[in-house]
């Protein structure tokens, strides 16, 4: 049973109510996600596909924004209901990316000594306030598929390089997946992370490193086994899964990823564009191929007995590029062209593989909507991916507007959703949800100054207060413990989830310890600016905080309205139970407990304690933790 109790619970008079709140609620996260018995009863407006132009209620708008952004706000709910789903998505796709590296470079130009902490503060600030919410949310999802991490000796101090990779993901979140794969393959930071940076062709003593070749196949594209468009397994005559590649295929791919390193600057100066013999290079531009170190042999890709002939690709041998031909000669140009064209052919072969559509569609659905999408849901999205030649914008649109994603009826058993629908909210998404719901702003800044690039003189840095979130939450933006992310898409929590053969990825980082550390950290984040049980506010200088204007006038003197609005902003109308205004004993479920706490356990003079205490209680509750 998930019953997190904060170690800080006695620092205010409401703290003693928290344990009772959680205990009385008594909801198992596992069962609420995995064992719902509801039948799939679509709302009438979805009977023949997605037909509703606009959300019918604020709650439906808030639920959509929970999936499509880092959390709904009062303004974003109103905007979505005004323009409708399609226009909202179109507007988000058209909104330019909020970038990280140029902003931090502007801070560095003022003499600030930067680190990964500044990158994290910028990430959290963008998640909480940036206008390109869908783009940033999809980029976050992609960062958990195309994993790069600062938890690596080569990148731990490279805040600028990791920021550049974040910008690659956000800038290309709605473009071609094939183009994004190429940018990832040529990222110097990815090259260092998965060791194809300065990877050399075979010699008498060495062979090409195979790390990136293996991961671009297993994790970034086709996966380990063949799948149908609906993500179901394709099996052989003995009923066994069929592998998509073997060691021989990895070896062939590894030979392609040789000769790539940091590009020469422009102008090249002393940098040799053919051999790369220099210490002068561009740290952020896509890696360039240096033909002297690129493998020139012929290569056979996907050459497995199980691979359909259409997927087999043979790359011819290259020209005589070693020793280096005369500078500027036709042969030198042929060598450059061979190296670059071979990479293009390989990326195209990967992107065109039929396994990419169901693999990527399934993972993006998991990150945005539900851990266990139906076969039909995956196939519908995969068909859009394939028909659009891997257009991520079209794919994300299909994910969000699919009938399975949009079906939700708070009054129906299981919300009228398919059996086993939903997912555990990722820890970072829990934080951004309550930050956005109540307009959190960073320390040291009034808000708008941080949107200028370069920042005006006198602006120092964004202070959101989460420099090491992996300690409390087991999650850190672009800081996974390995290339397999914080959790794996096919993780099955032991017990009822595994017995039902369901997936529960986010549960891989939830345990007794993180439940408590997360609850404690959320307390500190919600109560930022208050100390020692006092309701006197002191402006934080190192942490995000809720402006008093957001808290002091929030349904002042109207506890019923407060419960309803909290239910809307944080839980899109999904809060269980009911309450009877003015009657503390008649309530049921989470609504009843919360109303009783606000109406009967606190005085009207405790407005800040009411609002902040309620936000904290909801943020650590099992019902909030499950996204439905």
Question: What annotation goes with each model-predicted range?
Answer:
Residues 1-22:
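N-terminal secretory signal peptides that target proteins for export/translocation
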Residues 24-36:
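Bacterial N-terminal signal peptides
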Residues 39-41:
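Boundary at the C-terminal end of the N-terminal hydrophobic targeting segment
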Residues 43-52:
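Ser/Thr-rich, Pro/Gly/Ala-heavy low-complexity intrinsically disordered linkers and tails
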Residues 53-98:
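N-terminal mature-domain "stem" immediately C-terminal to a signal peptide or N-terminal signal-anchor/transmembrane
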Residues 62, 66-69, 108, 146, ...:
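Flexible, low-complexity segments enriched for small/polar residues
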Residues 81-84, 93, 104-105, 116-124, ...:
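Active-site substrate-binding loop specific to GH73 endo-beta-N-acetylglucosaminidase modules
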Residues 118-119, 129-137:
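Amphipathic interfacial helices
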């Amino acid at each position: 049973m998930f019953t997190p109790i904060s170690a800080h619970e006695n620092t205010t008079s409401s703290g003693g109510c928290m344990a009772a709140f959680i205990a009385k609620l008594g909801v198992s996260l596992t069962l609420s996600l995995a064992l719902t018995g509801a039948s799939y009863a679509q709302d009438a407006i979805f009977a023949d596909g997605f037909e509703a132009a606009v959300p019918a209620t604020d709650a439906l708008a808030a639920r959509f924004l929970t999936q499509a952004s880092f959390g709904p706000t009062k303004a974003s709910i109103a905007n979505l209901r005004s323009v409708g789903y399609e226009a909202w998505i179109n507007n988000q796709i058209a909104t330019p990316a909020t970038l990280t590296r140029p902003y931090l470079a502007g801070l560095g130009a003022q003499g600030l000594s930067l680190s990964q902490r500044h990158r994290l503060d910028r990430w959290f600030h963008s998640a909480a306030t940036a206008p390109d919410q869908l783009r940033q949310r999809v980029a976050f999802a992609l960062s958990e598929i195309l994993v790069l991490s600062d938890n690596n000796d080569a990148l731990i101090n490279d805040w600028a390089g990791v920021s550049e990779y974040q910008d690659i993901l956000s800038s290309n979140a709605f473009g071609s997946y094939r183009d994004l794969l190429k940018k990832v393959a040529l990222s110097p930071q990815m090259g260092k992370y998965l060791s194809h940076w300065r990877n050399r062709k075979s010699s008498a003593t060495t062979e090409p490193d195979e790390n990136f070749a293996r991961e671009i196949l297993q994790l970034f594209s086709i996966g380990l086994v063949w799948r149908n468009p609906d993500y179901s397994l394709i099996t052989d005559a003995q009923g066994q899964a069929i592998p998509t590649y073997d060691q021989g295929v990895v070896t062939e791919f590894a030979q392609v990823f040789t000769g790539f390193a940091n590009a020469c600057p422009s102008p090249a100066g002393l940098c040799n564009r053919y051999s790369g013999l220099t210490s002068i290079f561009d740290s952020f531009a896509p890696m360039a191929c240096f033909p002297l170190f690129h493998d020139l042999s012929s290569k056979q890709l996907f050459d497995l007995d199980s691979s359909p002939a259409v997927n087999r690709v043979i790359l011819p041998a290259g020209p005589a590029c070693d020793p280096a031909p005369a500078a500027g000669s036709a042969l030198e140009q042929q060598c450059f062209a061979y190296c670059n064209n071979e990479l293009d052919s390989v990326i195209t072969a990967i992107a065109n593989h039929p396994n990419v559509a169901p693999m990527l569609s399934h993972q993006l659905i998991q990150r945005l909507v539900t851990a266990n999408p139906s076969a039909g849901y995956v196939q519908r999205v995969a068909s859009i991916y394939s028909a659009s030649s891997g257009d991520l914008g079209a794919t994300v649109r299909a994910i969000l507007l699919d009938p399975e994603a949009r079906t939700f009826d708070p009054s129906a058993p299981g919300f009228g959703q398919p059996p086993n629908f939903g997912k555990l909210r990722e820890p970072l998404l829990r934080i951004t949800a309550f930050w956005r719901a109540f307009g959190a702003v960073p320390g040291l800044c009034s808000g708008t100054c941080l949107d200028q690039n370069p920042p005006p003189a006198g602006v120092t840095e964004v202070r959101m207060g989460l420099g090491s979130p992996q300690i409390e939450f087991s999650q850190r933006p672009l800081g996974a413990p390995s290339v397999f992310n914080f959790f794996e898409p096919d993780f099955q929590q032991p017990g009822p989830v595994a017995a039902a053969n369901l997936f529960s990825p986010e549960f891989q980082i939830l345990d007794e310890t993180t439940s408590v550390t997360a609850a404690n950290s959320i307390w500190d984040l919600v109560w930022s600016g208050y100390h020692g049980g006092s309701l006197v506010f002191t402006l934080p200088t190192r942490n995000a905080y809720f402006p008093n204007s957001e808290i002091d006038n929030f349904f002042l003197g109207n506890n019923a309205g407060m419960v309803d609005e909290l239910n809307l902003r944080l839980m899109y109308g999904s809060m269980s139970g009911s309450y009877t205004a003015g009657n503390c004993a008649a309530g049921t479920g989470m609504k009843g407990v919360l109303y009783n706490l606000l109406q009967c356990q606190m005085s009207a003079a405790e407005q800040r304690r009411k609002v902040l205490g309620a936000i904290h209680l909801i943020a650590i509750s099992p019902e909030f933790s499950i996204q439905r």
